[in-house]
């Protein structure tokens, strides 16, 4: 009951939940999402991506699947890889329909500045242990207000290993967020770790 669970809307990895005929701009002929590599190339070349309507249909299928599996609404929604207008607009429509808060880069809250980052991945390029030193040594400065560190800790199964380019980083993230040394440093510096549930209060 203490775990704050959200929906990570994905339109670039694996099979879509919606039937492929309903979301033609998102998937290939097998119903598999076009990859983030393809999407980033399209963005770089100023090519059209996908329609807002297709993104909305898929996001709706995903939130309904979440409700089926978890038995309740997600406490927040965020976006996987792409933060582009058609996807943001689609997810905002989901927010209005289900009243579930949306978290994305560039967001702003009245109660303070948000610094949202994945800066640890730059740190990992030159370090393969003692990841908590990213904070302790000041590589990442925690600012006044709300700071969001986006991490990807978790179990790496066959599907993840064969579809994701982020494997080593997941292991490093797990080591970082479970570090007792980091937890003690946060306590010593009176830095509170909160969930999105606390932000909504």
Task: Tell me the role of every PLM-derived stretch.
Residues 102, 164-201:
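C-terminal domain-boundary segment and adjacent tail
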Residues 8-14, 80-82, 107, 118-123, ...:
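Active-site beta-loop-alpha junctions enriched in small/polar residues
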Residues 2-8, 74-78, 101-102, 146-150, ...:
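Structural preference for beta-strand elements that scaffold enzyme active sites
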Residues 52-119, 133-136, 140:
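Catalytic domains of cell-wall/extracellular-matrix polysaccharide-remodeling enzymes
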Residues 120-133, 162:
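A conserved mid-domain beta-alpha-beta active-site/ligand-binding segment of alpha/beta enzyme cores
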Residues 1-4, 21-31, 67-68, 140-143:
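Acidic (Asp/Glu)-rich catalytic clusters
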Residues 99-101, 136-157, 192-194:
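Aromatic-lined glycan-binding groove of carbohydrate-active enzymes
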Residues 16-49, 165:
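Active-site gating loops and adjacent loop-to-helix segments of metal-dependent hydrolytic enzymes
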């Amino acid at each position: 009951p203490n775990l704050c669970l959200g929906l990570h809307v994905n339109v670039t990895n694996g099979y879509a939940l919606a039937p492929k005929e309903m979301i033609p701009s998102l998937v290939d002929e097998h119903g598999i999402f076009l990859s983030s590599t393809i999407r980033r190339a399209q963005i770089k070349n100023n090519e059209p991506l996908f329609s807002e309507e297709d993104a909305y249909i898929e996001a709706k299928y995903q939130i309904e699947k979440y409700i089926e599996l978890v038995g309740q609404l997600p406490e927040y929604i965020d976006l996987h890889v792409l933060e582009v207008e058609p996807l943001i607009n689609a997810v905002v429509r989901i927010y209005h329909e289900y009243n579930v808060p949306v978290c994305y880069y560039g967001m702003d809250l009245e109660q303070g500045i948000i610094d949202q980052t994945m800066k640890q991945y730059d740190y990992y390029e030159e370090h393969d242990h003692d990841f908590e030193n990213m904070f302790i040594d000041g590589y990442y400065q925690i600012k006044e207000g709300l700071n969001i560190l986006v991490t990807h800790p978790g179990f790496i199964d066959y599907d993840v290993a064969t579809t994701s380019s982020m494997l080593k980083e997941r292991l490093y993230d797990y080591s970082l967020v479970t570090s007792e040394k980091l937890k003690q440093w946060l306590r010593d510096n009176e830095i509170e770790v909160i969930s999105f549930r606390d932000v909504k209060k």
